[in-house]
């Protein structure tokens, strides 16, 4: 697993992510390893009203189990197959949300399942907006200890903590 970090947003941006929680839980289902993913994102308009589109990707081997957003907006589902590709089952789920004034907040959450771990190779740290706080959690049970995480391109500002609970 590779984890990448991207830069570009600043705390002066109008829309910021005040908190993001992104968890990945390794499990076995009928003897096959899968990864359950839950992502919860809180947004805030810091200067004026603005539109935003929280989104997540899914497809044949990554199911979208639930999507929700506070503050209005209905989930939309679209195919994102690139041109000149014979077959690609890539899809996106997104919300069209509007924060109507400074200080307005909203939240979005997505639940996905990676049914084939060949498609669980990267976790991106960056988001579309400046991130005030983000926590990634990976839970790997002892029965799946053959899976390992590899951090790549971490800046000194990123803190990585590993722990083993009583279950191993």
Enumerate the predicted regions with their spans:
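Beta-strand-rich, non-transmembrane domain signature
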Residues: 7-168
């Amino acid at each position: 697993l590779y984890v990448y970090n991207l830069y570009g947003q600043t705390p002066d941006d109008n829309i910021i992510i005040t908190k993001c929680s992104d968890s990945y839980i390794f499990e076995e289902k009928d003897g096959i390893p899968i990864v359950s993913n839950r992502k919860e994102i809180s947004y805030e308009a810091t200067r004026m009203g603005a539109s935003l589109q929280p989104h997540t990707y899914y497809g044949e081997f990554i199911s979208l189990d639930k999507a929700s957003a506070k503050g209005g907006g209905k989930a939309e589902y679209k195919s994102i197959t690139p041109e000149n590709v014979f077959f690609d089952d890539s899809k996106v789920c997104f919300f069209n949300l509007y924060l109507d004034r400074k200080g307005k907040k909203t939240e979005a959450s997505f639940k996905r399942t990676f049914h084939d771990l060949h498609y669980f190779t990267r976790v991106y740290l960056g988001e579309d907006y400046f991130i005030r706080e983000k926590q990634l959690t990976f839970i790997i049970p002892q029965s799946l200890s053959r899976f390992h995480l590899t951090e790549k391109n971490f800046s000194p500002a990123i803190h990585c903590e590993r722990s083993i609970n009583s279950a191993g």
